[in-house]
Amino acid sequence: MKSTVLKGTKKVEIPYFLNQIEHGTDKKVLIVGECVAADQISTSLIDKECKDVTTTDIRDRPEDGWLNSNTEWKHINSDFIEFDETNKYDYIISISVFEHFGLFWDNKSMFDNSTGVDDYIRWNHDIKGIVKSCKLLKDKDSKVIITLPAGPFMNYNESGHPILRYYDTQRQNLIKETIKGVGCKLTDEKFYYSPDYENWSESDSEINQPKFYHINNSYTPNVIWAFTIQKK
């Protein structure tokens, strides 16, 4: 078993999603954006004794990686926007993932770029990913559990490619309105802030106001928006 010592944003993100799911559940779980088990998300689910777990990512799972060596979980290699909607899940977990959708990561497009155009992003791929999650919910007790960086910024890599969105009030509200269109709603919402990535405190939506922009780290997110979606 890997160490479950949590670091950085995972100090609040992982406890948040664990509080939303049952211990020892045999319900179906999907982890979006997971292929290498680097951030203690998968190990936390093992500690929670979740059994029926599937991972999905646009990247392949390494053959000699930790997940293949320590679990029998299925992996679906796919652009999540194209994910098969006949698959239904009780819990869909996305921890700091959708902010990368449609952008770049490790010099790789975080979408199926069949056009081959270098200077190209899909700005609303994140919202499409969240909508896709909603369509995979099994029933009204099922949950999509998401964390995203809150704030007014955008991160870029050394080549100038955008790699990470932050979510200000306007985009948060756009997500809330969009999921209403597919028969879903937020059933839980929390904000977390840390000045040093070690000591975290729970906040509220007031932290989204421009008067608090100065506390946001523009290089590494230090304000987290955590929320749960369910069918109406």
Segments and roles (model prediction):
Residues 93, 101-231:
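S-adenosyl-L-methionine-dependent methyltransferase catalytic module, highlighting the catalytic core
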Residues 1-24:
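Class I SAM-dependent methyltransferase Rossmann-like catalytic core
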Residues 9, 34-39, 59-63, 80-82, ...:
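Short, solvent-exposed loop/turn segments at secondary-structure junctions
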Residues 30-83:
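Class I SAM-dependent methyltransferase SAM/SAH-binding core
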Residues 24, 44-49, 136-138:
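Short, conserved loop/helix-junction motifs that constitute active-site signature segments
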Residues 15-22, 81, 127-131:
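Amphipathic, non-transmembrane alpha-helical secondary structure
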Residues 81-93:
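A short acidic, Gly/Pro-enriched loop at the edge of an enzyme's catalytic core
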Residues 29, 92, 97:
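Receiver (REC) domain switch-region micro-motif
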